[in-house]
Each structure stands twice: as structure tokens, then as C-alpha cells.
């Protein structure tokens, strides 16, 4: 069903009308057409970039009418996209996406680097606890090359992990096996900052306060 809109090249639509228009277009993607007099415009919502694209539908090829239709489309497109053209919306989306990917890659590299620097050869005889407390929560075996990881971001309790197993989780973007949180470099603990709490029977982070 077409939408009839009283709109000219210099018009500024109230925000409530823009919100209504956005909603209608988002709900009717197939054949939404905006008509004012003899000008018809197709409007589409592109969910992938969260933006609207508007194109005039030219029923004739008179140059002056085509230019006016293009001007109306550009004006309305900027208003419905909060001051940006659809091209700008797409460009901003791609820029933000590349920044996010770069940030995520940097965070992942920092996490891997910290695991490498905090990993150590596990000698069960060096620990005062029973060997069962040295088993990795992923492999259920005592690791040859291990690293201490907090049980959750805010926990003071940590566990010994097999270095290769925890690295595999990170490469596959799997969550922390105990807390189900995203694994972060703040969870990686130096061996010298952990001790076995005999009373509570688990490894604990040394208080530095």
C-alpha cells in the first residue's frame, strides 16, 4: 500500500513523522512507495547497515522532473538517516566494522601473548596439593605446559589449564569453560601470584593490597 507524503525539496519532517515512516518501511519491505503529486520514490530499509535508501521512480524522462525527483530523494534520505546519505551510512558502518575487527584482533593477540609469557612447565612435585587439583578443566589431565586462569573475571580463585587447550578455545572464540564469559587477558595469572588454599582446596590469587 503506497504512503502519501506531503514533502518538498525544502521540507523538514517532524521527528514523529520520521519515526513513523521508518517503522512503516521496516515492516513493509516489498513494495513501499512514497508519493507526492507526480513524484514517486522507492524506499528500502537495509538491515545489515541499519540505514534507508531512497530512489526516485521516473515515470517520464523530462530532465527537470528527474532532477527534482533526485533532489527530493536526497533530501528525504538524509532526514530519515539522521542527517546522512545512505552512502555515508554504509561508509560509516564499514569503518566501524573495520575498527571493531582491528580492536578484537589486537585484544586476541594481547591475550595470546600473555598466555605465552605466563605458561610454565608443570612439575607436580613442586605443588603442595594433591595431583587431582592440577588437572586441567578442559582435558581433565595434568598439563605438561600449563597456565593459571581465573575461574571468572571477578573471581579470586584460579585453575591450572593446559596451555594448548586454552589456546584452542581462544582460536575458536569459545567462552570460558567455567564462567561462560569471554576469555580475556585479565584472567591470565602469573604462577608466582597463585597459591594453593589448603583450607578451601583450590588455587587462589595472592592478595596484593
Curated annotation (Swiss-Prot):
EC identifiers of the protein: 2.3.2.27
Localization of this protein: Secreted; Host cytoplasm
Keyword set, alphabetical order: Host cytoplasm, Secreted, Transferase, Ubl conjugation pathway, Virulence
Main location as per UniProt: secreted
Gene Ontology terms, MF aspect: ubiquitin-protein transferase activity
Pfam annotation, one family: T3SS_NleG
Reaction(s) the record says it catalyses: S-ubiquitinyl-[E2 ubiquitin-conjugating enzyme]-L-cysteine + [acceptor protein]-L-lysine = [E2 ubiquitin-conjugating enzyme]-L-cysteine + N(6)-ubiquitinyl-[acceptor protein]-L-lysine
InterPro entries named among the record's database cross-references: Effector_NleG, Effector_NleG_sf
Regulation: induction: Transcribed for 1.5-5 hours after treatment that induces type 3 secretion system expression.
Enzyme class: transferase
Disruption phenotype: Significant reduction in bacterial colonization in C3H/HeJ mice.
One BP annotation, GO: biological process involved in symbiotic interaction
Gene3D superfamilies xref list: Effector protein NleG (3.30.40.80)
Post-translational modifications: Two sizes of protein are detected in situ; only the smaller protein is secreted.
Protein family (similarity comment): Belongs to the NleG E3 ligase family.
Function in brief: Effector proteins function to alter host cell physiology and promote bacterial survival in host tissues. This protein is probably an E3 ubiquitin-protein ligase that interferes with the host's ubiquitination pathway and targets host proteins for proteasomal degradation. Mice infected with a strain of bacteria deleted for this gene were colonized less quickly by bacteria.
Name the record gives this protein: Probable E3 ubiquitin-protein ligase NleG7
Origin species: Citrobacter rodentium
Lineage of the species this protein comes from: Bacteria, Pseudomonadati, Pseudomonadota, Gammaproteobacteria, Enterobacterales
Gene: nleG7
